[in-house]
């Protein structure tokens, strides 16, 4: 997108895009939000969190944004407590205490589904959960990432937003995406993993009136 090979992208959440902009200086702008997701805790060895025992291993993604989200979900599940100032991207260093004497193992997100038999439980990214057929009903804990930093979004090059013709096209794309048809796909195809988020906010408004 930043190199001009494509006009829009629609895959990252706010935290990821903000991190990329900070790291690489991309001149990109958020033009719409897409959905919130559920990032869940799965296990092939236990049926409830209460069955966790000393020394059990919980795998989480090893990248900063998804790993941080996983830790917040483990806190919501009552497994551990994070430091009060850990915000939206905590690391394992931000773990203040454990309510269960478990070990956290950081793995590449794409390897976690296949590693599930080798650990006690694991937080699985939504895309891999869908690809591997993990159902929401089978989760030990359903993690709700319905907070704006975790919403996925559509982004454009900032320079293109000064072109009224491109803004008009982008507006049509956003309206087509934020539709009842998309909601139906979320419900019928993705098993409840995706939910519309932020559709009531028109992020293109400042550019349509420029």
Regions found by a protein language model. Name each.
Residues 1-7, 72-73, 93-123, 127-128:
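Short helices/loops that flank or line small-molecule/ion binding pockets
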Residues 2-47:
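Short, glycine-/small- and polar/acidic-enriched structural segments
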Residues 19-31, 44-46, 118, 123, ...:
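Ligand-binding "clamshell"
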Residues 31-80:
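A conserved helix-loop-strand patch within extracytoplasmic ligand-binding domains
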Residues 38-49, 151-169:
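A bilobed periplasmic-binding-protein/Venus flytrap-type ligand-binding module shared by bacterial periplasmic
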Residues 54-56, 165-176:
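Short amphipathic alpha-helical coupling segments at ligand-binding clamshell hinges
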Residues 66-75, 175-198:
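Periplasmic-binding protein-like
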Residues 126-163:
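A C-terminal functional module that forms or caps the active site or interfaces directly
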């Amino acid at each position: 997108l930043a190199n001009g090979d494509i006009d829009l992208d629609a895959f990252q959440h706010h935290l990821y895009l903000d991190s990329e902009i900070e790291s690489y200086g991309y001149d990109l702008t958020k033009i719409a939000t897409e959905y919130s997701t559920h990032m869940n805790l799965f296990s092939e060895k236990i049926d409830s969190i209460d069955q966790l025992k000393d020394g059990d291993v919980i795998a989480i993604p090893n990248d900063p944004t998804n790993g941080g989200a996983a830790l917040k979900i483990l806190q919501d599940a009552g497994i551990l407590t994070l430091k009060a100032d850990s915000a939206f991207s905590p690391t394992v260093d931000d773990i203040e205490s454990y309510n269960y004497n478990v070990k956290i193992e950081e793995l590449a997100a794409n390897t976690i589904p296949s590693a599930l038999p080798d650990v006690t439980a694991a937080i699985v990214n939504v895309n891999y959960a869908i690809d591997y057929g993990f159902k929401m009903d089978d989760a030990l804990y359903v993690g709700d990432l319905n907070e704006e930093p975790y919403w996925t979004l559509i982004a454009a090059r900032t320079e293109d937003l000064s072109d009224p013709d491109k803004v008009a096209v982008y507006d049509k794309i956003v309206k087509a995406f934020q539709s009842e048809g998309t909601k139906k796909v979320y419900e019928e195809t993705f098993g409840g993993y995706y939910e519309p988020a932020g559709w009531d906010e028109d992020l293109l408004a400042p550019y349509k009136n420029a």
